[in-house]
């Protein structure tokens, strides 16, 4: 039976949330762009998320045809960390079921995102009998190894992720690396998992101006070089590794720094209570590179193409990335990527072809990669062309079709077992 109506669950963050905040990133882009493409292909998609502000509407249809974002009340109207949602998941599930019952809605499949939403999808399966596919996006076991912090609840999360694995009818993994992590750390079987990467809207990131024009529009030297970081400002993104690499360059290749600028896109540089932002700003001063660094703050998706085009390279030195949407966006813009050899980045970025791999937390290695790019314009241009070509294989239209085939397979299996 072809799937025609999907309930997509994203409890803790809306696909319409402003980019660059503490809760927003690649998952928001994934849900928004996938839903838009599914709607374009004639599939009805209802995205359920928690209402966190009194100005949130009940229903927002701005993503595109056949797509609705539905805001459900569960707990106080306050912005929360992901972990703070856990105690209100039953309330969220009840609100979702009430919304569907009042409108006599039935869904062919549920597609849940992140561990909180997987908990809800499992409860809906118990109540409705509706099968569900799940995408973890990040894994608690990996976070526990790399990014444990005071607010983190690893035991609750990992236990829930294990329960989701037992209940879900299919797990969607972004990369073979995530598939391997699920099999190794969660004892998933190969049959439970289908690897389908996220996509990219290539048309959105195609160059509308030259790199010279883009840099000039950002107030930079048109004939200079710009290194770019885009993402949340949090320790596991390892922005400090980039600052340390610039300090290495200051010692090893000071002439190169005269035409170099590093721009950080993400977070709010004027928010006094952001400890990681404050630490990075102070660190740039302590290393004597603050005049080379600018903190641009978060930017909406519509603004990013100009930044990617202006960049000589995008740098992603993360400790952990399940996929790396920023890398794919940069590649679609024809910009090489220097990325740590972790998670999905090791599959997405092709070493020496679309950019460079580097060991995580090794600023000297990163500095070497930067020197190679800046001292060899021909190689940089060749990498940019290769990056653009590779990115075209990740078109959302094809990714959506692949997911639809999986959804149809899961729904057909339900009919056979009925």
Regions found by a protein language model. Give the residues of each.
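N-terminal subdomain of nucleotide-sugar transferases
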Residues: 1-69
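Carbohydrate-associated surface elements
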Residues: 177, 199
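Conserved donor-binding/catalytic core segment of Leloir-type glycosyltransferases
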Residues: 221-237, 243-246, 263
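Nucleotide-activated donor-binding/catalytic signature segment of Leloir-type glycosyltransferases, i.e.
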Residues: 274-299
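Short alpha-helical donor nucleotide-sugar binding micro-motif in glycosyltransferases
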Residues: 298-299, 306-311, 403
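Aromatic "clamp/platform" in nucleotide-sugar-dependent glycosyltransferases that forms part
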Residues: 319
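Short hydrophobic beta-strand element within catalytic cores of glycosyltransferases
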Residues: 336-339, 349
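Conserved acidic donor-binding segment of nucleotide-sugar-dependent glycosyltransferases
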Residues: 351-352, 356-363, 372-377
């Amino acid at each position: 039976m072809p799937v025609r109506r999907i309930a997509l669950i994203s409890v803790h963050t809306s696909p319409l949330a402003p980019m660059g905040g503490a809760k927003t990133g690649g998952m928001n882009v994934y849900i928004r762009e996938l839903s838009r493409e599914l709607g374009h292909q004639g599939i009805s998609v209802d995205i359920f998320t928690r209402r966190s502000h009194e100005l949130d509407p009940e229903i927002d249809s701005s993503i595109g045809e056949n797509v609705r974002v539905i805001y459900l009340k569960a707990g106080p109207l306050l912005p929360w960390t992901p972990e703070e949602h856990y105690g209100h998941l039953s309330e969220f599930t009840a609100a979702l079921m009430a919304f569907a019952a009042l409108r006599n809605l039935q869904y062919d499949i549920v597609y849940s995102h992140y561990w909180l939403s997987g908990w809800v999808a499992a409860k809906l399966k118990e109540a409705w009998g509706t099968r569900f596919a799940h995408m973890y996006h990040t894994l608690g076991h990996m976070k526990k190894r790399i990014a444990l912090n005071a607010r983190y609840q690893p035991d609750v999360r990992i236990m829930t992720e294990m329960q989701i694995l037992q209940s879900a009818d299919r797990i969607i993994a972004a990369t073979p690396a995530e598939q391997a992590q699920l099999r190794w750390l969660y004892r998933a079987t190969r049959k439970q998992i289908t690897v389908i990467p996220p996509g990219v809207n290539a048309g959105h990131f195609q160059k509308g101006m030259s790199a010279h024009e883009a840099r000039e529009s950002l107030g930079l030297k048109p004939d200079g070089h710009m290194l770019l970081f885009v993402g949340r400002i949090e320790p596991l993104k390892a922005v400090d590794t980039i600052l340390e690499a610039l300090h290495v360059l200051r010692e090893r290749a000071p002439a190169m720094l005269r035409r170099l600028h590093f721009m950080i896109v993400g977070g709010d540089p004027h928010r006094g209570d952001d400890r990681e932002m404050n630490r990075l700003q102070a660190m740039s001063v302590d290393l004597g590179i603050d005049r080379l660094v600018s903190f641009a703050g978060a930017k909406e998706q519509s603004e990013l193409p100009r930044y990617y085009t202006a960049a000589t390279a995008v740098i992603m030195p993360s400790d952990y990335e399940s996929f790396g949407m920023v890398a794919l966006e940069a590649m679609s813009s024809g910009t090489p990527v220097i990325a740590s050899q972790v998670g999905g980045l090791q599959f997405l970025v092709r070493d020496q072809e679309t950019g460079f791999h580097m060991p995580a937390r090794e600023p000297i290695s990163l500095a070497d990669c930067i020197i190679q790019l800046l001292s060899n314009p021909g190689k940089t241009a060749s990498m940019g062309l290769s990056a653009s070509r590779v990115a075209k294989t990740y078109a959302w239209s094809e990714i959506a079709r692949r997911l639809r085939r999986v959804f149809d397979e899961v729904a057909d299996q339900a009919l056979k077992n009925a």
